[in-house]
Design a protein with these regions (language model features):
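Conserved catalytic cores of very large enzyme subunits
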Residues: 102, 109-510, 531-533, 537-692, ...
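Long insertion/accessory domains within large nucleic-acid-processing enzymes
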Residues: 680-722
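A structural signal for well-ordered alpha-helices, especially hydrophobic packing surfaces
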Residues: 81, 85, 103, 470, ...
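Charged, amphipathic alpha-helical regulatory modules used
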Residues: 1-114, 702-705, 712-722
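Catalytic-loop motifs flanking and including active-site residues across diverse enzymes
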Residues: 18, 22, 514-521, 686
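Metallocofactor- and cofactor-centric catalytic cores in central/energy metabolism, strongly enriched
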Residues: 288, 527, 708-712
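Contiguous, well-ordered alpha-helical segments that form the cores/surfaces of helical PPI scaffolds
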Residues: 235, 514-527, 545
């Protein structure tokens, strides 16, 4: 048995053999693999390594001592780990080569950074890559994404991502923060809160409430990467409207104290009412300017959304009405006004409030008028068929949508995933999503056929891969401290978010969701039997039912709220085509276009009616309860009755319904109409166009340029029913 062993380092110098160095290296690999090794494990590893050293003659004539080259030492440790702890061994091998990988990675980061800086970036329609702040953010994002790919993913996960079988959304952000949320604004405001080491008192007036909510929104949304939704904003603002009303009444009475009588009180109330209405108008105008012109510290324009419509008090209905009227009025110079993009508006539809002849039908009519001019609000059914209406009808709970479409699974106050008893109720506000990973189903089917394997066997492999990624991400984020998002985790913006700054957030993660995304069901059906979702759709339905059964099972096993999400593929719609072609070539109606279809939607080029599209997509509606939207193209903005009939039909079906128009505005003369590239009034080609990207709006053309990628622009040209 050898007793004195030296290690020959890369520079040729000698170093004493030390068990502790082996332990340190193995510990790093174990941490990356999310495996815990104990003292017995380390003792076993060191003993086996020493035994392997003793099997080889390492006597060094020059130094007259047993000396093991460091390269051999690494190989021995690799073999031992692969035999005893394969997962740790894989991570050890990857980490060992990190210097080589790091040089390659930095070279790739530099190349992409130069491309973004001098050519531009259109991967996200909410960013303007011409701005310095955005370029800095993109540079950081490129580095962060490469670090994630090289040091968080396993070899198989990286291969699947590079090939395109799965798509990990927001890789640059996933290790840092959360995705989208329903922010509990009321909880933060009540009693005051701390932000940036400064104490904010609770607002005493409506105009102050608008300002403070704007500050909170910018502060909190910058600490996440997904959509930031303020749910039921009409209810949030109502108490502050009441405070302002009382203040204005007292103000009027103080000025007119020398007068007396009934008419003075009436005049005071009328004065106060008009002042509150003006505060609502200016408040929503302020939000529109702020949310569309001031970039966040992330370098983008935050995806802000608000929902409203079911509040019935004077102040709640006034809030809803003014949000709509301000959007319709537009922003800009006189004669050149056009609607803004943010906040996204969602109208909460209750048949018992907004139905024909009901108390708030007038508010629904106002929302329809607004949508026919601005494409917002989208309409969310609370009383139709399906999951979201069922929660509202049974518990009176509104599930507002996070960002453009994501919805939360139920989480009960006492029982968690399942109600503790008949009196237990679900809670939705204050919860968030921890990230989405999408399956590329056409590629998975093509792989199964290419390798003569059962489709569901291959699908299971990638489902399990996503499951593993979600579990690791869940554990990783749980170690984050509450100080990473103070407004959410310490000031009550999130459910359970009253932690101390140094507390880990793992205790409040159980109510949060993680998503399995789905794209290109139409192309999956085409690859299966050369038929579209309009012509068939049975195989696509079968696959989605299978995935739902799988997700429901592992949700119980892992105690994680997994959800199935209809992916809004932006740049992904083109990337997936490129990935498919690289592996399996160009196949008619599968990969012959520049883009794939979104989620379960019929192909945009289908020449079908609005009713046909609604019925065809209804088949999939209950299989995507983690996020979905249904929209149709309405080239008839002037026909309000037709739009009302079709939206009402969508509400009966339980849809989240969007009205699609192609809004166009001439920058030279201010003329506006649907879908124009050249102004028919003055002949100018300086036209601003607003189109629906997926579940949200963006500029397809502004100042002669687009923030959309080429694949999405190709899709726009073929839109008929979308």
């Amino acid at each position: 048995m050898k007793t004195v062993i030296k290690i020959i380092k890369k520079d040729g110098t000698l170093e004493d053999y030390q068990d502790q160095k082996i332990i340190n290296a193995c510990n790093l690999a174990a941490q990356r693999a999310l495996v815990t090794l104990n003292e017995h494990d380390y003792s076993t590893i060191c003993r086996r390594v020493f035994e392997e050293i003793n099997e080889v003659d390492y006597f060094d004539e020059q130094h007259q001592v047993e000396a093991v080259p460091v390269q051999d030492m690494h190989s021995i440790v690799e073999r031992v780990l692969i035999e005893l702890y394969p997962t740790v061994g894989e991570q050890y091998i990857q980490y060992r080569n990190y210097k080589i990988n790091f040089v390659k990675m930095l070279d790739e980061v530099y190349r992409k950074e130069q491309e973004q800086r001098y050519i531009g970036d259109v991967s996200n329609a909410n960013t303007d890559s011409t701005m310095v702040s955005t370029q800095r953010s993109l540079s950081y994002g490129t580095l962060s994404k490469e670090l994630y790919k090289n040091f968080f993913l396993t070899k198989d996960e990286l291969q699947a991502t590079n090939d395109g079988y799965i798509y990990i959304h927001d890789m640059k952000d996933r290790r840092d923060c959360i995705n989208c949320c329903l922010f509990d604004m009321s909880k933060v405001l009540q009693g005051g809160f701390e932000m940036g080491n400064v104490w904010y008192n609770e607002p005493k007036t409506l105009d102050t409430a608008f300002d403070v909510i704007g500050d909170i929104t910018f502060g909190a949304s910058a600490q996440q990467y997904g959509g930031f939704t303020i749910p039921r904003v009409d209810t949030i603002l109502a108490p502050y409207a009441e405070k302002s009303y009382k203040k204005y009444v007292e103000e009027y009475l103080a000025v007119t104290r020398s007068y007396a009588g009934f008419y003075k009180d009436v005049a005071a109330r009328e004065y106060a009412m008009e002042k509150v209405r003006r505060d609502f108008e200016q408040g929503f105008q302020g939000w529109e300017y702020k949310f569309n012109t001031v970039g966040s510290s992330r370098g983008d324009y935050p995806f802000i959304a608000i929902s409203f419509g079911v509040g019935t008090s004077t102040w709640e209905t006034m809030a809803s009405e003014m949000a709509l009227k301000v959007r319709m009025a537009g922003q800009g110079k006189d004669g050149f006004k056009k609607p803004v993009l943010f906040p996204k508006l969602t109208f909460l539809y209750d048949e018992n409030l907004h139905g024909a002849g009901k108390e708030l039908e007038w508010l629904f009519d106002t929302a329809l008028e607004c949508s026919s001019k601005c494409m917002y609000p989208d309409f969310l059914s609370l009383t139709g068929e399906g999951y979201i209406p069922s929660m509202y009808k049974k518990y009176g709970k509104v599930i507002s949508l996070m960002g453009c479409r994501a919805s939360l699974s139920p989480w009960y106050e006492r029982g968690g995933m399942h109600p503790a008893d008949e009196d237990d109720v679900p809670v939705f506000e204050g919860r968030f999503n921890l990230g989405a990973i999408s399956l590329h189903l056409p590629m998975i089917l093509a792989k199964a056929r290419h390798e003569s394997k059962d489709f569901y066997e291959v699908l299971d492999y990638y489902l399990e891969m996503i499951r593993g990624l979600h579990k690791r991400t869940y554990a990783f984020l749980g170690e984050k401290k509450a100080s990473t998002n103070p407004l959410g985790f310490t000031q009550g913006g999130f459910l359970g978010g009253t932690l101390n700054p140094d507390d880990k957030i793992k205790s409040i993660l159980p109510p949060m969701t993680m998503s399995f995304g789905i794209t290109a069901l139409n192309e999956l059906q085409q690859l299966y039997n050369c038929k579209s979702l309009v012509e068939d759709g049975e195989f696509a339905l079968e696959v989605m039912q299978y995935i739902n059964e799988y997700v429901n099972r592992i949700k119980e096993e892992d105690k994680i709220l997994y959800a199935i999400y209809g992916t809004p593929a932006e740049s992904l719609c083109g990337l997936q085509v490129e990935q498919f072609r690289k592996k399996y070539g160009i196949i008619e109606n599968v990969s012959d276009r520049a883009y794939v279809s979104n989620s379960f939607h019929c192909h945009v080029s289908e020449d079908i009616t609005t009713i046909q599209k609604q019925d065809l997509e209804k088949r999939f509606w209950d299989l995507f309860n983690g996020g979905k939207i249904q929209y149709c193209k309405y080239p008839i903005s002037y026909n309000k009755d037709a739009i009302k009939t079709l939206v009402r039909r969508a509400m009966q079906l339980g849809f989240y319904e969007g009205i699609n128009l192609s809004l166009s505005y001439c920058e030279e003369c201010g003329y506006e109409q649907l879908d124009m590239d050249v102004c028919p009034k003055c002949g100018s080609t300086h036209v601003t166009k607003i189109e629906r990207m997926n579940g949200y709006l963006g500029y397809s053309r502004v100042h002669g340029k687009s923030r959309y990628n080429k694949a999405k622009m190709a899709e726009f040209k073929e839109r008929k029913s979308m």
